[in-house]
Amino acid sequence: YSTQEFISEDMIKEIAAVDGIAGYDASLIVHEDFFNEDGEALKTERYGFYSYGSYNSEYNAMFLSGRFELVEGSHITEDMENGLIISRDLADWNGLEIGDTLTGIYYPESKTPAVDMEIVGIFDIVADKDDAVNLYDNASYFDYSNYTFCSMEAAEGLLEGWGDENEGI
């Protein structure tokens, strides 16, 4: 169920304080472009990136469901400023590893800011198209290899200025 309302940070803190709550995550979806330290666009499987701005990525449904498994580094936590988790495929295609910095830009043709993010984790895709338990999401045209998770602060930074006067398509 969704009211399409944004959940404020105060609401998140109030929910997290409820006795019995072990952890939480809230997501902000961003479709940015990524560039390596030489300014080159990253190689991807198809289309673009599907990024979750995250407070605590270990509680994201993609990890909780078993579709993804963190295999290197750490999850995004609420105290990280510009952390980034990428897929093993994306790391291999682009020669990336933990500690490398990528630059994300939400809409390169506009005035949205570039945000530098450090790779803090790498995940494997466990989901299998033939496995009903970890069903691959055929409803999305984004390939799981192109999913990323960035700290909420980074996601909000990517959207800074979006929708202001003279912005947009």
Residue map of PLM features:
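Basic-flanked hydrophobic alpha-helices used for secretion and membrane insertion
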Residues: 1-169
